[in-house]
Amino acid sequence: MNSEAGARARYEKRKRQRVYIYIDNIEPQSKKMPEAERDKFQEAVAKQLTTLKRATFTGDVALKIDLATTSKNAPQAHTIAKNLLDLLGVRRSNVKWPRRHLLYKDDRQIQALSVSCRHGEISPAISIGAQPFGAMLDDLELAAEARRSIEMSSDYFYEQDREADWIKTFRDLIDHETNYRRSLGGDGYDAYRNMVRWYAQRAMLKSSGVTIPVLNWMYGRPKDITTGFGQERWASLIRASKIRLQVGELPITKGSSDVFKQTVSKEIIAFKNRWDWLINPLVVSVALEVIVRPNPATPTAVLHDLDNIVRDYLLPSIVPKFGTVSDHRWTIDFNELQRTNPEIAKSWGANPMPPPGTKSGVTRYEAWRLPAVVGEPGFVSVALLADVDATGDHMDEIDQSIKAWASHSDRNYRY
């Protein structure tokens, strides 16, 4: 990094390459969005790009979309994202803008994508953040260095051990249920098991995701330091993880899509056979983390865009098979909360739930595309991440890690 001051200066310079678009007068909609609303959305994007004096991205992009819907019949987040991703590309004929494209030329430029949505809000919102993917990788490298001191501390290792203990405790509870029921009583056992299940699921599903340093190493960063453990080795470790869904290579030949979908279904069955004792039923809300490495023989014309991978191949099987929900509020028993703690129940308001039709889904999905490796197969690896700590996606985590590191550096500099 040469120096901490230099690293911070370069980070601030990269931040100026980012584009932020915020629209609060258009309801997020799927492809059924009226033509006039589509024009209105593109006009808003064009206006903000003009104000920012920004042109169309021509290279690889990291993209983040946050949505808020108000409609009682709001579509699922991935169908909204599909519509918006298309609208961020080719300019519609009625929209005034000097270029043929708006934010980017083709959504296959997107190498990292994050989509989140909250339904049942008071006001609609569409928030879009974009930056050159190369700048994102530089941020990732800085964040990985910032995380190193945290993840090498004794407190961090103690926290990891404590999290793992919840899983062991839950396994012990179900293996020795008769003894525990005798000592705790039926109601006492049920209440304790439910509490431990929540913490155990949270621990297991948190650990299934890749950390910032590992993500950094999988991209071959830092480039100028030999670690003795190449990026393909880190990818192999992720591919071998039993707490992730390993669904093989993306289809790149005619007729192979159905085979890939069957592979996804088979892997879900195998995963549930290993973990249903812990995750069925799911009592925590989850997000999806998808790591994709294409086969080096993939023709450019058939390279799958990241949203297509999640929308067409993963969500249709994962959501119904695991019973995932789009909002953590669906995991709360408000009747039980009213009985046990009426004050907290009251603080949620008279009608705390999102519209019923929006229940199925995930709280967020993010996908990262690794570069192909000559002589190595492609793969798709998926983690169901516990989304209960308000930590956000990896893009948020990168900025938060750098912010914490910079704050610590400031204190050291002053004192």
Walk through the language-model features, giving the residues of each.
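Acidic, proline/glycine-enriched N-terminal capping motif
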Residues: 1-415
